[in-house]
Amino acid sequence: MASMSSGDESLRLCMFDLRRGQTEGQELEKILFFYPADLDFSTQLSVIGLSEGLITFTRLFSPEAACEVIEAERHSHVFYEAEPDIWMVMVVEKNKETGAIWRIDALRRVLKEVHSLFVMFHGSIRALIEKEPTGGLTRSLLYPFITDYLSTFQIWSLSEDCCCEFFVGKKLQLPTFRETLRERGTVQMLTLARDTAVEVQSLVQVLDSCAGSLRCHSMILFQDLLVSTTLSADDTVDLFTFAVMRLTSKALSSDTSSWSYLRKGPGSSEISSRSNLAPVGSIDSLHSRNGNNMHHVIRPLQNDKWTKGKDGFLITDIWGLETGGSPDSAIPTIWLQQTQERMYLLAYQHKSLTLLLLMPTNAIVNGDLSISAVKQQVIEDASLRILKIEENISRGWGGENAYHIKGYRYLVVDNDTKVSRSSPSGKVTTLAKESLLALNKLREEVDSEKSRAKGQEKDMEICIRAKNNVWVIARVTRGKELYMALEKGSDTLLDTTDAVGRFSNRYCSGAFLMD
């Protein structure tokens, strides 16, 4: 991870609405979020004005696909149109001396992830703006949400076996070439034995029946791996990402080697406390000082806010309790992309197994269902099955190196199901820096080809021998991607091709065999 100071020009992150602030004197209205928030308005408008100009200019030549990235001498400008006319832009400083070498698509995936998580909890940004046209409500939700995401979202470090955060002190950690064998925006699946898979399917049916005739959804995780889901691929990725951040046994355990516990420096606490307030540099901070911005802001990504209750269900006070409301008003809720339904989220945990159960909120409001009744049904009907499945999986689990394949350092991505599998982080660290840089550059070439193809599937096969004699390989076919580094210097191109073929046959059902 490359460290970027929050006090200099190394990073700017903003979100703005092209439909707002087009009248002279009202330019500030277009700003929905800006990091660092304490920059003066003129600097914020300068960054957004340049970004807006680049978007407008590139649309002249490519109306259907506007600006994705602009490479300047000192900075990279990464663009992501989160919703129609609502843009997120990340401006990062180039600095090879600090290891700030990244893949643009990896940075764009950070923007996409934070937007997807925000929508899962709060709904679309455009809908919020239409609900409250001044933009005050939208900003009051965006500022703490993105700040919490940046300051506490945990990523498995490739340099050591522990969690690191985007913020370490006042340094912002961005994904670099060292994470090139990882794919944000995908889930990692657990491979099950046949008998265990049958038991899991039976458990899913039991969970579905706990709400009677109502259509529910469920997700099951073992540690940080997905076991089962009844959600769409997009909804699965969003909920899986949140679960790994805050709900799994690893996320809840205070004795794991997480930097959020080991690094309680002033920077971390400063960011946490600051995100409770309207940022000094935001246009809503003026109103908040006068007491006009006092509504309760839900901050789902706050750290250390979930605990396990005596009945096995996870509890949190993030959603609070509405005055005069029912206890159900404190239950977490999320939006599903596929059905546009608002769902209650219940989380149950037994050792390393975490179950997530989603139920439509309108059923609770209408009195068709009660949360307490569903919880009791889960305990009565599913607890023994859960215990047995957790025991079986734990007994057969190979640990953190379960998916290590001797001689290979790899990443496999299925874009249709949004599932990925890769070499364990500890094994990736054995690659030389030159190997990772070569692989990162190869992935950039594939990203460029995919961008030029404009969504059309295109088979690709690239095999390059780098200066340190490492072979880096990319194969893309039928929505699936394989990236690999082979550091056996004596291998010829034919040896390398055969090695990739053996890998494809044994571990990918022959998906990457090329004619």
From Swiss-Prot:
InterPro entries: Ccz1, CCZ1/INTU/HSP4_longin_1. Keywords: Endosome, Guanine-nucleotide releasing factor. Plays an important role in membrane trafficking through the secretory apparatus. In complex with MON1, acts as a guanine exchange factor (GEF) for RABG3F of the Rab7 protein family. Promotes the exchange of GDP to GTP, converting RABG3F from an inactive GDP-bound form into an active GTP-bound form. The RABG3F active form is involved in protein trafficking from prevacuolar compartments (PVCs) to vacuoles. May serve as a linker between Rab5 and Rab7 protein families in PVCs and mediate PVC maturation. It is found in: Endosome; Prevacuolar compartment. GO terms for biological process: vesicle-mediated transport. One of its GO terms (cellular component) is Mon1-Ccz1 complex. GO terms for molecular function: guanyl-nucleotide exchange factor activity. Belongs to the CCZ1 family. It comes from the Eukaryota. Interacts with MON1. This is Vacuolar fusion protein CCZ1 homolog A. The gene is CCZ1A. It comes from Arabidopsis thaliana (Mouse-ear cress).
